């Protein structure tokens, strides 16, 4: 008699304690049992979260399965994350797909915040992606842009698939910088596209229900990830095995050569074979598709905005007058080009939710109590379209950036296309150097029109979802 009563008492106590909020959490939309708020996230998560934020506020507390999620949709909230509490929110949440692809978290993008990550980040920033190193690849960029122009020239009487041409260009630029000669984007493009799709948000059941990881085997995701991971490893193993380039000058060394030299110089460093493989795949993945997608959005926006296209062509053609190709030295004079690139990155994010972060400890955030282990989503897309920060935010208007101090380097929190803080993208200079050169040369040499008599208002500037967002057409 007493034992069952004791069990009931314990159960009621735990139930009541669990039901009684002991923390001051941000506002939250109503949840369903087990799945939490997952049912409220549509195919375009950034739009779903923006719409929820309009009703519940720019700081929300959601549950994705069993995972607590802090969603931030304002510049003030982003400033708190990236500046005030950057170290607290410097971790990454577990991703079953990324963990398998990147050798149990040995890369830079998805790795947890540890001393290992700090060493790897320092190596990438100082040795691979410094301004000097990026400038050393200017010949690669100019050669690949020349090939792009030739390909468009040879196809100019036909309807062209610019998306395919852009991913080939960016892939070859990144590939030559990372791997050197002997490789091109076709060496890894199929694998890359598979993995980028699998890394898209909410693909894995295990990430939201850790005890249900077996479901990903049933759905086939685990099998696909295993096959892709084995393909990546075989490709990268071949790269390392065949990579000998002793005659290359130090100024023009590719990324693999640099990392192998670091490994040889310090056998006790973190730079082992799996680390090198992970970093190289980071560079190939983060560089190829994201840069191509940004270019696709920019050219699409210019075609849809004839006035902006006309102004840009006027600037580029005046500065490049008499030249068959725009050179990198010409770009510094092109203020409207830089404004176009900034405006395109404001409206059309390749990663609109940024890469998720995770709280490393309990923290007081904007008056709310956030527990350690809470995942953090920054809706950078919504922040960049916030009417409290931008006039007519839905309009493509490059003029807003002329004579404006706002930049993409992570210090203006209303505009964070590359993120900010410790986990901000270190490849900004690499990406911008490709983007500006391509756009300047393409609009200098060609005029564009939509196929089959399509009207501008029929042009689809919405997105399809993966880890990066592409135009649907």
Swiss-Prot record:
Q: Which SUPFAM superfamilies does the UniProt record give?
A: Cytochrome P450
Q: Which GO terms describe its biological process?
A: coumarin biosynthetic process; response to wounding
Annotated family: Belongs to the cytochrome P450 family.
Q: Which Gene3D superfamilies would you find in this protein's record?
A: Cytochrome P450 (1.10.630.10)
Q: Which is an annotated Pfam family here? A: p450
Q: What is its main location?
A: membrane
| GO CC terms | endoplasmic reticulum; membrane
Q: Where is this site: Substrate specificity?
A: 109, 286, 290
| GO molecular function list | heme binding; iron ion binding; psoralen synthase (NADPH) activity
EC?
A: 1.14.14.141
Q: Which organism is it from?
A: Pastinaca sativa
Cofactor entry? heme
Q: What triggers its expression? A: Accumulates in roots after wounding.
What are the binding positions for heme in this chain? 425
Name assigned to this protein: Psoralen synthase
- Description of pH dependence: Optimum pH is 7.5.
The superkingdom of the source organism is: Eukaryota
Q: How does this protein get used in biotech settings?
A: Psoralen possesses photocarcinogen properties. It intercalates in double-stranded DNA and cross-links pyrimidine bases under UV-A irradiation. Psoralen is widely used in combination with UV-A radiation to treat a variety of skin disorders like psoriasis or eczema.
